[in-house]
């Protein structure tokens, strides 16, 4: 007689909907609850839970809806049995067929460590690499899934505009069109703009080209009217470090929403809050963050009160051993930005919050190439205000865009040269 026959009941559970990124096969689930703990503790969105008891227990999203977290796909890496897998990657390739390349993420300024898996010329998936100083073992969903846009609208050959239509051309024809136009134009009428994801090698080559060949100082890496002081490198860095956030005992957000501007950084702030119940204060109501925070104002007058020791926050900063003040880009766009930044910096210096041991002053950049461009001093001679005003007034005759797609101006008679990898907004207006 057979002694291996199954006598008990089999577990057969219908697959749950968890959104467009996570594919579920719940019959594989062993109820380890890693995904529940991740959603509740790390992501800060308690949308996963267990219902039922004993052998009837099931993992589910409470209302059959997508996980509303920018870290949601990390549950795929956490699941030990393949009950949660990547929906866009399913049936795309076998792991042993893929070439694995270790690299750095460019979707934000954090620089998460990632591994890119390619099959032939196609990027199939992006996975996190462990780096305890930066991203630990997490990456944002944007980092993980932005690769699906890489194969669309690739610029694989030069294009020249003929009769208002971009037509493929040879490199010789493209260079001839560019050199003829540049040689007939005065250097002060030529401007260049560096893009958000332009690597430092290209940026340096562009700077060299503008200084030595064109002899123009109109090269700018900012596409918005931003105040930045590049006299000292610490004026534009995240000085407390991402890992340092964990020991901070007071966090002040000034005009920034780290949940969307730097997702991985936000997870560190949440980690600190859960561990130490650190006080988090925000100047500006930034909406739903994954931890409790106190909004003290929606205007910049409060900053002046803090500097003048007229606000309760002043005393908290003085008493704090490791304060962390994070300036967002939205503050640096203000006309009062030079005053706000410099005075707040002086205030921190006076109270010994900027020293060799700990620097409380932090700038949270949005783009991966920002700090590299500042390091290379790719900033127009006077300020971004002047060059962007000239751009809006159509004072330039030639614009060279190095992967820059965010400029806000109306094209009139400018001759636009676009250098980039994809047919984005910049390529569509190029000549």
What are these regions (language model features)?
Residues 48, 84-85:
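Short hydrophobic beta-strand motif reused across regulatory alpha/beta modules
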Residues 21:
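Extended, Lys/Arg-rich, non-catalytic nucleic-acid recognition/anchoring regions
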Residues 18, 29, 41, 46-49:
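Hydrophobic alpha-helical bundles that form the membrane domains of multi-pass transporters
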Residues 3, 47-49, 113-115:
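Short, surface-exposed charged micro-motifs
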Residues 10, 14, 46-59, 226-228:
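Short, conserved phosphate-binding/catalytic loop or strand-edge motifs used
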Residues 25-26, 32, 36-37, 43, ...:
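Catalytic alpha/large subunits of respiratory electron-transfer oxidoreductases
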Residues 1-8, 12-13:
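Single conserved hydrophobic/aromatic residue that forms the stacking wall/gate
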